């Protein structure tokens, strides 16, 4: 069965966002990443700025803080409301048209569909560090810290909401090392597997 939907999960600095965008362009299909923040904000009733800062990063302080987080009258935390809004938006987008969706636990949210190709992009530390230094104009020490912090927040969010382990190969159809394969080959492999 052809894969209508491609989800891209990625380590920070691996180029996963770039690879996803290029695959969407080459296939002539929709690409969703940060641009769905407005839709998530509308669905949740929270500001786009709040969603941008918190959608992939909650729960912020672990289970203890989560237990005491602010809740609405139904008992849902703000983090849960954001996740639920994100889930609804992703399901709507996947039902509407072929697309590439980057991040936001889309692989798990769409796990019951047969027409989804789930990809995890990772890379080697030196290449990821250099990419972050170049993209964000930071020194090596800051790049390493940004990488560790971002991946830790992504992992915490993913593990909490999916009850799976972020980056574990069995959760994905493909795991690709962008440092070893290069972006171009990653794109070609994804497109070939999506046929």
Specify the residue positions occupied by each region the protein language model found.
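Pre-Walker A (Motif I) flank of P-loop NTPase domains
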Residues: 2-11, 97
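Glycine-rich phosphate-binding P-loop
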Residues: 8-21
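Short beta-strand-centered segment that lines the nucleotide-binding/catalytic pocket of NTP-utilizing
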Residues: 30-41
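ATP-dependent small-molecule kinase phosphotransfer cores
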Residues: 41-98
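Small-molecule kinase domains that catalyze NTP-dependent phosphoryl transfer to phosphate-bearing small molecules
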Residues: 59-66, 139-184
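Short, amphipathic alpha-helical "lid/cap" segments that border enzyme active or binding sites
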Residues: 87, 183-191
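RNA pseudouridine synthases
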Residues: 93, 109-112
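Conserved phosphate-donor/acceptor-positioning beta-strand/loop module used by diverse small-molecule
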Residues: 112-134, 140-148
């Amino acid at each position: 069965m052809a894969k209508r939907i491609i989800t891209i999960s990625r380590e920070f600095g691996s180029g996963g966002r770039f690879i996803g965008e290029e695959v969407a362009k080459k296939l002539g299909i929709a690409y969703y990443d940060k641009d769905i923040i407005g839709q998530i904000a509308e669905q949740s009733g929270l500001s786009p700025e709040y969603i941008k800062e918190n959608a992939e990063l909650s729960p912020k302080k672990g289970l203890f803080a989560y237990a005491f987080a602010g809740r609405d009258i139904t008992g849902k935390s703000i983090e849960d409301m954001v996740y639920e809004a994100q889930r609804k938006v992703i399901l709507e987008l996947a039902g509407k048209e072929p697309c590439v969706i980057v991040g936001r636990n889309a692989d798990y949210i769409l796990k019951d569909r047969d027409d989804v190709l789930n990809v995890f992009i990772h890379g080697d530390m030196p290449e990821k560090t250099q990419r972050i230094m170049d993209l964000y104009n930071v020194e090596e020490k800051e790049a390493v810290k940004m990488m560790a912090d971002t991946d830790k927040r992504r992992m915490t969010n993913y593990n909490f909401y999916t009850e799976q382990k972020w980056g574990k190969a069995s959760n994905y159809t493909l795991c690709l090392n962008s440092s070893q394969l290069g972006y171009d080959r990653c794109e070609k492999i994804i497109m070939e597997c999506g046929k």
